[in-house]
């Protein structure tokens, strides 16, 4: 479907002009190079916000960034997904991972140090060289032949400690590095330890570095088997309260609760919850290859909007600067007035406040620049980006839909993702409507004597009870009529508007399934069909 799935990006263009492209990846790259990049270069966007995008940024596989305090289980989580050790992996209760490790697919197992990694044009890490040797000495790529890594890559980050000394001693701007990765990954997973929940100051700053990437963030409350149900409720509440103070978004973040390692659960009270949460998280990760093109398109749109706003800010500062005297005083005045300038530009160009960069960070950066060397506003560059946003995005969305339709669904496979897809350990196997699927005896038979007693109190005529009498008993379940109507439709196998004793027992069994919290089947599974109705049941078309 996309270039990183084996199909060549770019390719031949269709007839219809330079804007017609053959692949989504080629279209995104072309739009960026022709429409957005000239605007970025004219107003020093790369110095203020983010380095220029390269081919590898458009062609790389979906990436997941793991962030958390030390010993929350980040490296163990990767080991759990891959079901395999990887080069550079260190696990322990003390702070172990002191480097950023990009875990990627490779035909042979090995590792590449950061300085060599940032000169490889095939890897999307070349722009990390701007963080210097202090960072590059703490960055490596771990490659291994693993089925999971054929579809995704994972970035393991150093465990975050509390304290100012640890932050300073890194030798590089940790939050800036996280922000760089956040702009390029498909999913950001924040890991918390349910047994020792804490959000340090540096972790808070790290989370704030993800501003504008809220849609990518997922939260994992790990090691939840180490606390009982009552404690887990308190921990979950405390986590949501703490996150609410750090992440400024009205939407509630999705939190996955579980124990993500291949060891026995210490507390099995919530086993069913943990399994359901793990499957939800797996489905979210498995969907990343399908959504990668949409994510890249969304990131390009966000980048283009920010580049436009940046151009308005820089050109305004240039326009306000005097030509001869008082330049430094005017510069200080403009920097202090930046919040007012933001409001003025919002009104003048009808731009949302959410498109503007953070005021404080922008003020700090502007201190280092000579405003007289900024460029005045170039309307043609702005018009090119506006034209892209208005007219060029829609065809790409259509192309994404076409590629998804023409190409089989690609899901992440291998590792932990294969452990619950087949056999009795598949989620929901032998539960709810699936109970008794591999048994010879009719599963309803074990409770049928109880149901028969009820049946004969409902005045059966010729071995059947009417819909009116059946309703009197079924409504005692307090289920809504819409659900009871579906149960009636499933239980009335011969569609005669009445229930015999087996059909009534089936209806009571389906009610029990629903009351236990399981979903009803859309059609009656063969193993639930009453024995006396199995030959007469009409075959599905």
From Swiss-Prot:
**Where is ATP bound in this sequence?**
68-75, 223, 261
Give yes or no: UniProt keyword ATP-binding. yes
Output the SUPFAM superfamilies linked to this UniProt entry: EF-hand, P-loop containing nucleoside triphosphate hydrolases
| Sequence positions bearing N-acetylmethionine | 1
Identify one Pfam family in the record.
Answer: DUF5600
A single GO BP: endocytosis
Please name the CDD domains in this protein's record. Answer: EH (cd00052), EHD (cd09913)
GO CC term, one of those recorded: endocytic vesicle
Annotated region G3 motif: where? 156-159
Found in which tissues?
Answer: Highly expressed in pancreas and heart.
Q: What molecular function does GO assign, one term?
A: GTP binding
Q: Which residues carry this modification: Phosphoserine?
A: 162, 459
Q: Where is this region: G1 motif?
A: 68-75
Q: Which family does it belong to?
A: Belongs to the TRAFAC class dynamin-like GTPase superfamily. Dynamin/Fzo/YdjA family. EHD subfamily.
- Protein name as annotated: EH domain-containing protein 4
Which gene specifies this protein's sequence? EHD4
């Amino acid at each position: 479907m996309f270039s990183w799935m084996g199909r060549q990006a770019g390719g031949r263009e269709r007839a219809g002009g330079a804007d017609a492209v053959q692949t989504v990846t080629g279209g995104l790259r072309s739009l960026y190079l022709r429409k957005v990049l000239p605007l970025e270069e004219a107003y020093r966007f790369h110095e203020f916000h983010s380095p220029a995008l390269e081919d590898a940024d458009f062609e790389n596989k979906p990436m997941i960034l793991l962030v958390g305090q030390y010993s929350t289980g980040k490296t163990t989580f990767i080991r759990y997904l891959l079901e395999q050790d990887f080069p550079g992996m260190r696990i322990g209760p003390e702070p172990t991972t002191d480097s950023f490790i990009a875990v990627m697919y490779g035909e042979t197992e090995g590792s590449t140090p950061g300085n060599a990694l940032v000169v490889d044009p095939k890897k999307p890490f070349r722009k990390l060289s701007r963080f210097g040797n202090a960072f590059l000495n703490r960055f490596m790529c771990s490659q291994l032949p693993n089925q999971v890594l054929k579809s995704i890559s994972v970035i393991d980050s150093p465990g975050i400690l509390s304290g100012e000394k640890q932050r300073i001693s890194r030798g590089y701007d940790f939050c800036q590095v996280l922000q760089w990765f956040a702009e390029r990954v498909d999913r950001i997973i924040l890991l918390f330890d349910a047994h020792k929940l804490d959000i340090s100051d540096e972790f808070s700053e790290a989370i704030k570095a993800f501003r504008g990437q809220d849609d990518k963030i997922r939260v994992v409350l790990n090691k939840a088997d180490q606390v009982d149900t009552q404690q887990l409720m308190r921990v979950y509440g405390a986590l949501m309260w703490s996150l609410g103070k750090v992440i400024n978004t009205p939407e509630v973040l999705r939190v996955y609760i579980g124990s993500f390692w291949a060891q026995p659960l210490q507390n099995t009270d919530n086993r069913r919850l943990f399994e359901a949460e793990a499957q939800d998280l797996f489905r979210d990760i498995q969907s990343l290859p399908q959504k990668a093109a949409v994510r890249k398109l969304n990131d390009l749109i966000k980048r283009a909007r920010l580049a436009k706003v940046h151009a308005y800010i820089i050109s305004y500062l240039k326009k306000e600067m005097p030509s001869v005297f008082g330049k430094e005083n005017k510069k200080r005045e403009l920097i202090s007035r930046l919040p007012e300038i933001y409001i003025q530009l919002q009104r003048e160009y009808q731009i949302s406040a959410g498109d503007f960069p953070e005021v404080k960070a922008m003020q700090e950066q502007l201190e280092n620049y000579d405003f007289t060397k900024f460029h005045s506003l170039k309307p043609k560059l702005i018009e090119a980006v506006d034209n892209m946003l208005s007219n060029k995005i829609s065809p790409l969305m259509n192309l994404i839909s076409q590629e998804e339709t023409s190409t089989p669904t690609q899901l992440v496979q291998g590792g932990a993702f294969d452990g619950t897809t087949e056999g009795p350990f598949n989620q929901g196997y032998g539960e709810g409507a699936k109970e008794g699927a591999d048994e010879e005896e009719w599963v309803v038979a074990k409770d049928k004597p109880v149901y028969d007693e009820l049946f004969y109190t409902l005045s059966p005529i010729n071995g059947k009870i009417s819909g009116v009498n059946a309703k009197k008993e079924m409504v005692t379940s307090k289920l809504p009529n819409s659900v009871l109507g579906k149960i009636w439709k499933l239980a009335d196998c011969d569609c005669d508007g009445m229930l015999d004793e087996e059909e009534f027992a089936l209806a009571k069994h389906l009610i029990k399934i629903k009351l236990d919290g399981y979903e009803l089947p859309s059609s009656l599974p063969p193993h639930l069909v009453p024995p006396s109705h199995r030959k007469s049941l009409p075959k599905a078309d």
